């Protein structure tokens, strides 16, 4: 009996060992998807197992989404920074746009400058022309040296003394004679313009005369010798030819023969500077008081030679100078008497 029971026990033990080997072999196999089951009850219901699997998947998805969002957030922050940088880069672009506007303003300025340059160039051209014209005038005026001016005035005096006529009556003759004493090749227009300028300079304003320099004083003396103290020259007597014809005048129904008003070749006297100082002097009324009328006195004076007139005029200047000295002496006496009277109580 004992022997029979032992094989059974052995068989049972062998069965248990074989079952343990099978279980160990099962445990040794890798599990594909181990799922933790909280209780046996959950295993018994398939809906509960599906819910557990869905929750785990949703948790996984939420975890993945949160991870992804974090990664995207970490990736977006540089993007935002890059956006800011792009904005910062755009601001220079805007600035560059403004700079383009600023660059356009120089273009406008350049256009204005060009326009101003055009106007200024025209103005400069006009000014240059005016300046050249002024320079030409100044050059034409500077052509005459001091020696030339004195030579011209002296030639005028000599011509008038030799011929008894004015240089204006014989321009060609006077020009041919006087131009030899000029240091440059002078034209006739320049020649007589210079004579006119002398008269304007020294007799244009009788109150103020250009006598600042010694040269002007010398020229003024020569000009006075030619034109006189008042700048009115003795002109050459002008001959007017009038036909010797009778003028019929009816008076009381009777015709009377009247002599011509002006005879042929009769000289009409034009009184000039030499006659003017003579008329303004005391000589004319004194001589007229002796029995001659003033017209006859003036007419006879116009026929006197230039040398004689000049000599008498110099004497009159001495008389005038003595008159001035006498007047100054009278003024000194008057001043002294006035001062004495004011000091006397």
Swiss-Prot record:
List residues modified as Phosphoserine: 105
**Where is the sequence biased in composition, kind Basic and acidic residues?**
23-32, 114-137
Which GO terms of type biological process are on file? cellular response to glucose stimulus; negative regulation of gene expression; regulation of DNA-templated transcription
Compartment annotation: Nucleus
Query: What ranges does the record list as Polar residues composition bias?
Result: 37-46
Extent of Low complexity compositional bias:
11-22
Q: Region entry Disordered: which residue ranges?
A: 1-145
Q: Which residues form the signal peptide?
A: none
Where it mainly occurs, coarsely classed, is: nucleus
State the tissue distribution.
Expressed strongly in leaves and flowers, weakly in roots, and very weakly in stems.
Tell me the function of this protein.
Answer: Transcription repressor that binds DNA in a sequence-specific manner, 5'-GCCT-3', to regulate the expression of PGR. Acts as a modulatory component for the glucose-triggered developmental leaf growth process.
Protein name (record):
Transcription factor STKL1
Organism for this UniProt entry? Arabidopsis thaliana (Mouse-ear cress)
Provide the gene name from the record. Answer: STKL1
